[in-house]
Amino acid sequence: MGKGRFDEKENVSNCIQLKTSVIKGIKNQLLEQFPGIEPWLNQIMPKKDPVKIVRCHEHIEILTVNGELLFFRQREGPFYPTLRLLHKYPFILPHQQVDKGAIKFVLSGANIMCPGLTSPGAKLYPAAVDTIVAIMAEGKQHALCVGVMKMSAEDIEKVNKGIGIENIHYLNDGLWHMKTYK
């Protein structure tokens, strides 16, 4: 998805309202991807509320309900929760924690290197490669970024160099600044 994928507001190409059958399919996909979301899904996406897909540049689609940006994906890829949603429902993703030193890099969009996950202050929890995770930071209450495991937690510990987690969406990026879409 590359850096700065949500930089310009005018990159929204169109917005479509989804049919009930499509919404059902999306909800099933979300339940499959994020089993922990089940008790909250009807709260996040109430049955009566229209669900829209906002299409952006680079084939990015953002799922919105009542203007709230909930999930996004690229092409037919997996859905990722937005940080705003994650801050309300922090337990829908497994967590990984970086040390204090990694914070400024994560917030500038950098990928997370293995040493930032294995040093004192970091907490590395078991997770397989390709798992979507919430990146927490030492001393911070809320997730800083949504990432994807590029290596398993076990390999991150063993190898301890290179990119451990790809940074997909971080605080203060363009998607964060979109806030809502009416």
Swiss-Prot record:
GO terms for molecular function: ribosomal small subunit binding; RNA cap binding; translation factor activity, non-nucleic acid binding; translation initiation factor activity. Phosphorylation is critical for stabilization and promotion of cell proliferation. The modification Phosphoserine is found at S119. Keywords: Cell cycle, Cytoplasm, DNA damage, Growth regulation, Phosphoprotein, Transcription, Transcription regulation, Tumor suppressor. It is found in: Cytoplasm. One of its GO terms (biological process) is ribosome disassembly. Residues 93-172 form the PUA domain. The modification Phosphothreonine is found at T82. CDD domains: MCT1_N, PUA_MCTS-1-like. Its main location: cytoplasm. One of its GO terms (cellular component) is cytoplasm. Pfam families: Pre-PUA, PUA. It comes from the Eukaryota. Translation regulator forming a complex with DENR to promote translation reinitiation. Translation reinitiation is the process where the small ribosomal subunit remains attached to the mRNA following termination of translation of a regulatory upstream ORF (uORF), and resume scanning on the same mRNA molecule to initiate translation of a downstream ORF, usually the main ORF (mORF). The MCTS1/DENR complex is pivotal to two linked mechanisms essential for translation reinitiation. The PUA RNA-binding domain is critical for cap binding, but not sufficient for translation enhancer function. MCT1 N-terminal region is required to enhance translation possibly through interaction with other proteins. Belongs to the MCTS1 family. This is Malignant T-cell-amplified sequence 1. It comes from Rattus norvegicus.
